[in-house]
Amino acid sequence: MPHFVINNRFQKLTKSRGVRVEHILTDEILSDICRRITGHDDFTCDFIDAEAEGRLAVLHYGNRVAYISYSPHEVGGRNSYFQSVPTAMASFYEELNQRKNLYFYFVPSIGSSYETLYHLFMYRLMLTAGIDFLNDEDYITRPIHPFISPDDLINARDRLSGRNSSNNSTYATINDYGGIDVFCKTYGASKYESTLLSVALAFLSDQRINVYQILEQNLRLLPERSRNIISSFDNTNLIEADYTMERIEFEEGNSLRSPRYLYNLLATLGPKKCALCGCEIPELIQGAHIWPVAAIKRIRRSIEEKIELATDGNNGLWLCENHHKMFDEGIISINMQGFVDIRPDMTRFNVDFIDWSTPSRQLRPHILTNSFLWFLEKRYEVPA
C-alpha cells in the first residue's frame, strides 16, 4: 500500500500558531495526491515529530518513491511561495532510488494569488527543471508549458525583469562565446530562484553554463545542497565571484569584464542591447566603460574604491562590438546631453557609414542618470 512519510512541524512563523503539517495535508488531500500518482486512493501515513525542511511529502509505493513539494496555505511574499521547491529538489537529488519522481501540488490557500506573472514564470521554470504538476488544472486557468530553449527562458526572464526590476536579483545571458552566464545573488529568497534557473538552463542546453555566485563581503555562497544540485550537471561550472576575483581582473588588464561588472550592468541597464544601434544579438554585445579602467587605475584612491568605480553599473553602456570599438578609439563620443558626436577629422564617407550604422544618435533618458553623467564627466576630464 502507498505510504507517506512527512515531517509534521513547520519552520518559522506557523510554529508559534500551533499549526502542524497534518492540519494542512489532510486525509482528503493526501488521498488526492496518492490517486494522482499511483491510481489508488488508499494509503498509510507517518507524520514524524520533526521539523519539516520546507513543504515536502514523500510517498513510497511499490519500488518507487515520489517527492511532493506543495504550495503554502497562507499569504506570503512571492519569493517565499517557491522557496521550498529547491529544498524538495535537493532531497530528490539525494535520493539513491533511481525510480523516483518530483512533483508539485497546489493546496487551498488563504488569500493567495496563483497566477501573477512571476508565478507563471516560475511554474514554467519548474516544469523545465523536471518538476511535474499534479493538479494545476484545478488552480491555474491557462496552460503551463516548459521553456523550449535557453533563449526562450532568458527572454521571458528579461520581460519579467522589465516589469519589476527592483525585485530582480538573478540574471542570465548568452556570453561572447555562445555559452550561458548565470549571475546569482546568494542571500534571501533570491538563492532559491537562482537554483531553479540554473537547473532549468542545464536541462535545456548542451552549452557550457557558468553559474557565478555574486558574493558580498560576508562571502555567503549558495546553500550547499543547491551547489550540489547545480554541480551534478556535466555542463555547469559553479564559480565564486568574490573580491579576490575582482581584484585579479582589475589589476591584470584594462578591459575589465568581471562577473560583478556584468551583473551590475544587467541590473542597471537591463538585457544586452546596443544603446546606439539596437543590436540584440547577445554574443555581439559588450559592456563598455564610460570612465575607462586604465584611467581609474591612475587616480589616488584605495584599491577597494577603484574596483567599486570600475564595476559600478552606472559606469557603462551595452554596445555592440562595432560601436564599442568606435567609442574606445574616440571615433565617436557622447556629450553631456547624451548626443553622439563624430570626430571632426572623419571623411565624408566614414561619417555617412557611422550615421547609417547609428540610428540612435541620443541615449535614452533613463540612461542619463546623475551617476552616469558623473562617470561621463570623468571620462573627458583632463588629468591634472
Descriptions of predicted regions:
Residues 4-36, 40-262, 279-284, 358-362, ...:
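A boundary/linker detector
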Residues 250-253, 260, 267-271, 279, ...:
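A detector for short metal-coordination/catalytic motifs
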Residues 1:
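Carbohydrate-interacting/catalytic domains
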Residues 274:
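The canonical Cys-X-X-Cys-His
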Residues 287-290:
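Histidine-centered catalytic micro-motifs used for acid/base chemistry in nuclease
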